[in-house]
């Protein structure tokens, strides 16, 4: 199936990938050039893993996981395969985010810095906990085959909304963290005097913001949504559970097929059904008067 507005989608996708990749490159340049590099010894070098892993995993990889269903050249792949890729990317993002938080806590322990005192830390840790919860719920409800369609119908809109909300929250948290770090480390010259590190890192923040905006735009365009697979039935709750409506859809489809195959047979079947309904009503009336 051809995608409507394919060229526009492709342009935005390439732009998002380019801006996201530049964000990762910029955060690496920041810590390697301006912040003395990376390490795992309780010093500031260990802390530097925090922005690198947060931007790479929690922002860039999570953004790709959000739009993976929108890639038109994957529409011929099975839904199970795409679910596995979506879950795998989110799992990688969660692992990198966890390691980034561990690096911060170890740095604070060694340097005797208080934990969890800033708004950045409150929002960031909350987002990580909810992100892991979202990943676990999605795994058991959507990836494993045991969940009933009615449960999936209930969870799906919550899953979509909370995923986008968490992605936006993560971007806001990263921007808060970058600004907070610059206020701490830029003393001579100070942040407000426009030092090269401050300007460079502000540019990193703008790249992250643009990447998030592109991902939000791509994932909210209805014409770029992955089409339903042939024979599938949308998960809805209005008017009964999903399983009942699936059976009803199959019955309706069968009736249409019979009509198209032989109009005479369809007419005789309709007349027979009418006679049965008449007899049934008569029989029902007799039973009600007995």
Curated annotation (Swiss-Prot):
It is found in: Cell membrane; Apical cell membrane. InterPro entries: CYB561/CYBRD1-like, Cyt_b561/ferric_Rdtase_TM. It is an enzyme of class 7 (translocase). Heme b 2 binds at residues 70, 79, 86, 159, 225. Its main location: membrane. It catalyses: Fe(3+)(out) + L-ascorbate(in) = monodehydro-L-ascorbate radical(in) + Fe(2+)(out) + H(+); Cu(2+)(out) + L-ascorbate(in) = Cu(+)(out) + monodehydro-L-ascorbate radical(in) + H(+); monodehydro-L-ascorbate radical(out) + L-ascorbate(in) = monodehydro-L-ascorbate radical(in) + L-ascorbate(out). Highly expressed in the brush-border membrane of duodenal enterocytes (at protein level). Also expressed in liver and spleen. It is a multi-pass membrane protein. One of its GO terms (cellular component) is apical plasma membrane. Binds 2 heme b groups non-covalently. Residues 257-290 are annotated as: Disordered. Induction: By iron deficiency. Up-regulated in duodenal mucosa of mice lacking transferrin or Hfe (at protein level). It holds the Pfam family Cytochrom_B561. Residues 33-47, 106-118, 180-197 are extracellular. The chain crosses the membrane at residues 8-32, 48-69, 79-105, 119-144, 152-179, 198-222. Signal peptide: none annotated. Fe(3+) binds at residue 108. Keywords: Cell membrane, Electron transport, Heme, Iron, Membrane, Metal-binding, Oxidoreductase, Phosphoprotein, Translocase, Transmembrane, Transmembrane helix, Transport. Its EC number is 7.2.1.3. Plasma membrane reductase that uses cytoplasmic ascorbate as an electron donor to reduce extracellular Fe(3+) into Fe(2+). Probably functions in dietary iron absorption at the brush border of duodenal enterocytes by producing Fe(2+), the divalent form of iron that can be transported into enterocytes. It is also able to reduce extracellular monodehydro-L-ascorbate and may be involved in extracellular ascorbate regeneration by erythrocytes in blood. May also act as a ferrireductase in airway epithelial cells. May also function as a cupric transmembrane reductase. This is Plasma membrane ascorbate-dependent reductase CYBRD1. The gene is Cybrd1.
């Amino acid at each position: 199936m051809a995608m409507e507005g394919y060229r526009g989608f492709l342009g935005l996708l390439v732009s998002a990938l380019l801006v996201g990749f530049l964000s990762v490159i910029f955060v690496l340049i920041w810590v390697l050039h301006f912040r003395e590099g990376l390490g795992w010894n309780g010093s500031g070098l260990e802390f530097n893993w925090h922005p690198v892993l947060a931007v790479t995993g929690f922002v860039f990889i999570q953004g790709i996981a959000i739009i993976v269903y929108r890639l038109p050249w994957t529409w011929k792949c099975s839904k199970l395969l795409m679910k596995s890729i979506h879950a795998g990317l989110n799992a990688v993002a969660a692992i990198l985010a966890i390691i980034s938080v561990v690096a911060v806590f170890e740095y604070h322990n060694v340097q005797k810095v208080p934990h969890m005192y800033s708004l950045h830390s409150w929002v960031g840790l909350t987002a990580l906990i909810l992100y892991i919860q979202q990943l676990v719920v999605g795994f058991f409800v959507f990836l494993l085959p045991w969940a009933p369609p009615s449960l999936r119908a209930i969870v799906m809109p919550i899953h979509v909304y909370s995923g986008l909300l968490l992605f936006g929250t993560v971007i806001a948290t990263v921007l808060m963290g970058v600004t907070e770090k610059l206020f701490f480390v830029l003393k001579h010259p100070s942040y407000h005097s426009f030092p090269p590190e401050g300007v460079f890192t502000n540019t990193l923040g703008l790249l992250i913001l643009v990447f998030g905006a592109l991902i939000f735009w791509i994932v909210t365009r209805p014409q770029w949504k992955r089409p339903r697979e042939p024979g599938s039935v949308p998960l809805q709750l209005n008017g009964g559970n999903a399983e009942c409506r699936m059976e009803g859809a199959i019955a309706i489809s069968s009736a249409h097929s019979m009509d198209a195959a032989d109009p005479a047979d369809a007419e005789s079947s309709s007349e027979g059904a009418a006679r049965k309904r008449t007899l049934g009503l008569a029989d029902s009336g007799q039973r009600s008067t007995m």
